[in-house]
């Protein structure tokens, strides 16, 4: 683990620390030594799981891992864990029970009962819940003479202003129901947009379900964390679709914004006309979305026209430094447009630095699982994700992934690694255009031709020459869900280097390596007829092992219509071929035509 030195010591409270002397605080331990050691071990285990390259900051990791406000000062991190307060610095651990003893505080069960209390300006009131019989939303209030944001009007003409302790509060303490029945849209919008006024940097969502039937427009928010409790924002039939709104959760001009454990799910039983993409990000920096699910169920499309588009997530334009980690993207609409995650720069303002990590993607809709396209995009990492596309829908993806497109001015440094892929499509797995420094490595790939395919199939292809630099250490299983076809099928096309892959071919293909510069150290097991193994390899075909299992090839090496400006090394390959040929179906090791 790479981070600054860390130490845990006793301290009195985060609120005290934010306004008083900072440093190591002495206190009499309130728990037994053995209990303390158990808690310390739990904290250490969580911290040890921190991976520097999987979060925008160590502070963010602490926030969503411990689900706590985090205060940082002079290399000290202060946060809560269970009923304990923690100060963290330099790899030693000490803890203290939170002191909940309150003096001079008036206790009351809920807000309704608070309104008729006989209180004076300056009094502090503590509630156990916001609404009666909900057991959530408790908070402290300061009695004031003037109204203010989220203040409660009292019967005596005074106001109870919620106290934002340690720069954090729950959305339930501000009046959200969190019951999936009452619409919480406006309270959520007001709370987030007023974070600076409330002196709040952490907003907790403590309930399971929040009904939101208005667009959540979040703009110009800085240094804020929304921490859910496996919470889901539900959009149902009462959504306000009188005007078209492309993005439901619309994040714009924000900086340093963390969302964790806050999922979004559509739940429609009528046609909804004013909704499309669940999350959109525009002109924003340092956005981290973790531990959440974006769900568009199959029922959504059944109520719509087939040409409607539904997409989970769209990094739309002008973004920088985004992390999406441990999320689920479910899009089962079977629509003729829409996909899982768009990474684009719509107005060519420049976008860079995004990581998509440890997530699950399941899609039936027509378009890509992940598409990197349009404008100028730099530095994309797609790592350790699981992708699933089955052949059950009426619609099917043309390609599963796009890395650069005809609309791309720049698509540079795209790394696709350590993913587990089980997909089908009508056109191909990965297509790349106008991209540079594209690397595909260490993936497990099961790619199939869809039963709906009626045109040529290219599994991994650069649509202009050599935009994919390297395909390395992948395990590829290729097959077809279409029993009979006459179109061309290409596996690797226009690649600079294909290195150390294991490839299994279970259906008829045209060629395995087409216009690949170098093919080195690959193991290929072929179980169906193939026309060509290597077509116009330009530099090296070296140390490969190619095995044919009761099937034949037309020509192993095929060269046609190219200029040879340098030597081509074909060395140290092993070819296992036991097919019994006849004079009518003879195979050729090398065939060359129209060379110059």
Where are the language model's segments positioned?
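Beta-solenoid repeat scaffold
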Residues: 84-93, 146-149, 153-155, 165-168, ...
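Classical Sec-dependent N-terminal signal peptides that target proteins to the secretory pathway
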Residues: 2-26
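Fold-core signature of tandem repeat domains
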Residues: 324, 354-356, 380-382, 414-416, ...
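N-terminal extracellular ligand-recognition/capping segment immediately after the signal peptide
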Residues: 111-112, 129-142, 189, 196-245, ...
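Bacterial Sec-dependent N-terminal signal peptides
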Residues: 17-43, 47
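Extracellular beta-strand/beta-solenoid scaffold signature
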Residues: 188, 212-217, 238-251, 268-282, ...
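Surface-exposed receptor/substrate recognition regions of extracellular proteins
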Residues: 35-40, 44-190, 194, 206, ...
